[in-house]
Amino acid sequence: MDKEKIVIQGARAHNLKNIDVEIPRDKLVVMTGLSGSGKSSLAFDTIYAEGQRRYVESLSAYARQFLGQMDKPDVDLIEGLSPAISIDQKTTSRNPRSTVGTVTEIHDYLRLLYARVGHPVCPNHGIEITSQTIEQMVDRVLEYPEKTRIQIMAPIVSGKKGTHKKTIEEIKKEGYVRIRVDGEIYDINDEIEIEKNKKHSIEIIIDRIVIKEGINTRLYDSIEAALRLADGYAVVEIMGDKELLFSEHYACPYCGFSVGELEPRMFSFNSPFGACPTCDGLGTKLEVDVDTVIPDRSLTLNEGAIVPWRPISSQYYPQMLASACKEFGIDMDTPIEELSKEALDIVLNGSKDKEFYFEYKNDFGMTRETWIPFEGILPNIERRYRETNSDFTRDQMAQYMTDLPCPSCKGYRLKEETLSVKVNNHHIGQISEFSINEALDFFDSLELSEKETQIAAPIFKEVRARLGFLKNVGLDYLTMSRAAGTLSGGEAQRIRLATQIGSRLTGVLYILDEPSIGLHQRDNDRLINTLQSMRDIGNTLIVVEHDEDTMMAADYLIDIGPGAGEHGGRIVAAGTPEEVAKNKNSITGDYLSGKKFIPVPAKRRKGNGLELEIVGAKANNLKNVNAKIPLATFSCVTGVSGSGKSSLVNEVLRKALARKLNRNHAKPGEHKEIKGIENLEKIINIDQSPIGRTPRSNPATYTGAFDDIRDLFASTNEAKVRGYKKGRFSFNVKGGRCEACKGDGIIKIEMHFLPDVYVPCEVCHGKRYNGETLDIRYKGKNIAEVLEMTVEEGLEYFTNQPRIARKLQTIVDVGLGYIRLGQPATTLSGGEAQRVKLASELHKRSNGKSFYILDEPTTGLHADDIGRLLKVLQRLVEENGDTVLVIEHNLDVIKQADYLIDLGPEGGDGGGQIIATGTPEKIARSKKSYTGKYLKPILERDKERTEERIATAKKK
């Protein structure tokens, strides 16, 4: 066996055409090719799947059932595999407890740091908490005036389950007469009933004293006895006032604020020892959001200002509101913004104990009369959300609720005691709020004592290394407290990459899926250096990537194609980037050598004279931003990672437009106003989320073509004779579908120690329909055979059916002619799903008042696919007069835009400002813009290429 190569023979996963390929080991290998050409099939479904499967195979059958074994890939032979680690974009944790700090393990090191060198500081008095001497305890008690009655106790059981009989017997032997159990005082000889399954607190009453002169010695002896019995703790109850907790360990000598022994779990918000009890360590509480309940305060109650109580099916709540307003004298025809504070308080929060007469008449004419207090809209929504058994009701109520910072921990997720522990006057929550850059500066300037420095040195080394890795992959703007679920696919992937670098493993096969997604050109070099450093310590990297810089930095480049889907699945070219660039068969090579390129438009559109203006945007890191977007243009928002692009476009603009135009309830990010909405009629967000979550959804159903196809089959003579309607040709309802598999075409067989097996249905043989339905044919094919066609074949087949042909033509236009009409939506990539959505918009008639938003549409797209996508986007603007707004880093897209808005200058707190606006040429001239710096040479290069091409064409 050749130890220098990974040898693959006969790979046939998905669309791979029985290919053989050799991949050099310990090298940076990039796989590229058109979207859908088979890159992921080779990298993830063949190489990674086999590497993972071989590892799982080595485990016992018992262990295998917990791991979910992977299917054996369809391949004849793979040799030279190392243990494989896949870093893709789909495995991001959506757990609200996961943060950047926990995922990268930085938080674990911080917990250790605080447990070893942290100093508890009393939050009430600001003094450092140290262990107290008995003298300090006595002095604290004697501060109370004479004749104050006190009771000295030893807390021997604190919040523990059990009957504690043995403990009480031992107290008896010690000669003590009284004890306090859960706040009640008992004689030691009483029959004390203690429930076994509840938590209890037990204190021995040591002494009862009245403060006066000359009791110092007795007080000293009593406290000493309590400390001895309770392992260094004593409780002094000031009768009729409060209790003081004293500790030989850690407690404030003034107010008794006490911190237990410092240990790492105390600083974890995922542990009951550290988590804030109010929010359970989540940092937020779900509360009803008044602004979502009443989005438009200029409306009156009669005009439906209260959105959740607008009459839909039942009149119950509208009638209740009318009766309450009548009783409490609230005018239902006064706009909400003009109602008195008292009146609005009753409407929102209820009438407390005041009752009103309520007569409710239901739809069946029955009447109910009662006197009840008015619950209030906000408590009503919260109650219905928490108490309902209906998922529908809970989802409806959730629309009006939002996560607000927890009032107890202020969003830091931790207990008050934990947050009292400081290092350099900062608690662990404050350090987690730092960006990666700020954290590096903090640890570099940290001043500790000699002993503490010695203890913390190995911790600092690990923390600095991990922070450095995050900086090197372009994530220095993130904070460690950022929830993992809010990260983009590219950010999450680069975090996992940084974590892997931190592990310093060697001899591993890493498989990465487009790590450059969401990364500005400025940070791309750092990412490439990171990949090369992983290679240099002895790892093999296989990177599925379309970025030109990454391809040119590769040791070995594999181009898979030549086309997509059925037209792909072959190795077109393999070798160094220079060798691939010279290969005449390779489309990638043509783009690398400059034979093919995406041209710069001859002119930039000015728009239709109207514009959309965002005023005073302050969401996340935006610094009171004002931005204008000309309508009827192709505009692009650019800027380094973390500069505020998504905050401006997705958080503020998209949600505000959706709320106004689509009646969506999502609350937009903070902003003053958006002008010019009256010039739009609908907003369409075309993202990369799946077009359907079940295999029953497919491109034909999503674009609406399947409705027309079913109409066509129902209109055939045979179908009319049999009385079949269009519903007969649906695989989702009874009638025409195969009932053995319920229209799925496959049957799932559960295997306990092996992966579930899916077998074709024995009745319909995977065709999804019953025999009678399949008898109906149009132009020689039945409905199942039509669903098996590719879109290109379908277009030819339905060429004389304009309604169907128009819809299929748009799918071909976006470069998806290779997918099958009935291909399950779950098998489409993010880029493919996005283009199916675009196609379904293209065939709709437009009046030029649609606003399209796309967030990084080039994800997963080859330069050739990008060229096709740009033609479609330009068509939406050119033919329909619609507006397209794109968030993008790809310079091929940026150079084609009519108008750019560049945010920056940096990421995180260093961003959130508009650096430059205007045409790409204007941005390229800006000295402050990082985008302009990288755009300028591209514009110059491509203009030269265009001129050369024109000159060559003229000579011919």
UniProtKB/Swiss-Prot annotation:
Domain ABC transporter: 309-587, 607-936
InterPro entries attached to this UniProt entry: ABC_transporter-like_ATP-bd, ABC_transporter-like_CS, ATP_grasp_subdomain_1, P-loop_NTPase, UvrA, UvrA_DNA-bd, UvrA_inter
Molecular-function GO term, any one: excinuclease ABC activity
Compartment(s) where it occurs, according to its Swiss-Prot or TrEMBL record: Cytoplasm
One GO process term, biological-process aspect: nucleotide-excision repair
A GO cellular component annotation in the UniProt record: cytoplasm
Alphabetic keyword roster: ATP-binding, Cytoplasm, DNA damage, DNA excision, DNA repair, DNA-binding, Excision nuclease, Metal-binding, Nucleotide-binding, Repeat, SOS response, Zinc, Zinc-finger
Primary location class: cytoplasm
Binding site residues for ATP: 33-40, 639-646
CDD domains cross-referenced by the UniProt entry: ABC_UvrA_I, ABC_UvrA_II
Pfam families linked to this entry: UvrA_DNA-bind, UvrA_inter
Zinc finger (C4-type): 252-279, 738-764
Family annotation (PANTHER family): UVRABC SYSTEM PROTEIN A (PTHR43152:SF3)
Function: The UvrABC repair system catalyzes the recognition and processing of DNA lesions. UvrA is an ATPase and a DNA-binding protein. A damage recognition complex composed of 2 UvrA and 2 UvrB subunits scans DNA for abnormalities. When the presence of a lesion has been verified by UvrB, the UvrA molecules dissociate.
Family per similarity comment: Belongs to the ABC transporter superfamily. UvrA family.
Subunit structure: Forms a heterotetramer with UvrB during the search for lesions.
HAMAP family cross-referenced by the UniProt entry: UvrA
Protein name (database record): UvrABC system protein A
Gene that this polypeptide is encoded by: uvrA
